[in-house]
Amino acid sequence: MLPPSWPLATILGAGILALAAGLWLRQRRRYESAASVAAAYDRWTTDRLLERLWGDHIHLGYYQKPAPGRHQRQDFRAAKAAFVHELVRWSALDQLPPGSTLLDVGCGIGGSARILARDYGFKVVGISISPAQIERARSLTPAGLSCRFAVMDALALELPDASFDAVWSVEACPHMPDKQRYADELLRVLKPGGLLAVADWNRRDGPMGRGERWVMRQLLEQWAHPEFATIGGLQQHLQQSPHAAAMAIETDDWSQATLPSWIDSIAEGVRRPGAILGLGPKAVLQGLRETPTILLMHWAFATGLMQFGVFRGSKPS
């Protein structure tokens, strides 16, 4: 029997955590092939839970440092839009003229593509391996906005060489079993003089302790990731590509600027309970099932086990 001094909220909280852990341990999403990645994103898209909580940007946000003496935090969804604008600025895509062509590799349901087309005048082609994501991206895109979407494998792009003025890819690399092939395809379709903008979840260099190895295994097996590259490793893959043409790749670490996203993604369920409850009991269980992985991601990025790498470069003419 539980001690009578235990408050009901504590008992309920412990029960919810136990349920979340049970679902998490029994329902892994190990990477098996490109089809397993497509299936995972098809499920995440059709159940609408991720979209209800994260909006139409299925990536982390960029949080500006508050002004001195102020502690107000950025809104989760506003931070996601800010991420797009910050990566555009950092990679100098804002120097390209309206009408420039841009390929979004791993476009999700098209949130970034729509900003890039609407706010910068790019002609965007977005690709994803998930048919459900592409269907949803098309349905969310207003008529007249210069965005096209297609189901395509990032490791075998069905696109001509040197066909885009810019190539953009955010948080897609973790799902790629062949990082060199991924780098090669990004640069193959980039025109001479074109700009590259990539963001990636990276593991740190160096050996890991036993606990860190356990965490890393969970981060791989829960969300269909075959392996994480290091920042230096992906930089090397890009620079040594036969399509790089002596291209210099610059990098930065945005771990701190993106870190609040993980806890905010859980907090969205508290801020918008109707978003989950309106989808029914299955969505509630699904939300619980994702929570341990999100918490481990936060821990990994907070401690430096994981890093949020960004990569930019201009392909020589």
List the model feature ranges, each with a label.
Residues 180-195:
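A short glycine-rich, Lys/Arg-flanked "PGG" loop and its adjoining helix->strand segment in the class I
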Residues 155-166:
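A short acidic, Gly/Pro-enriched loop at the edge of an enzyme's catalytic core
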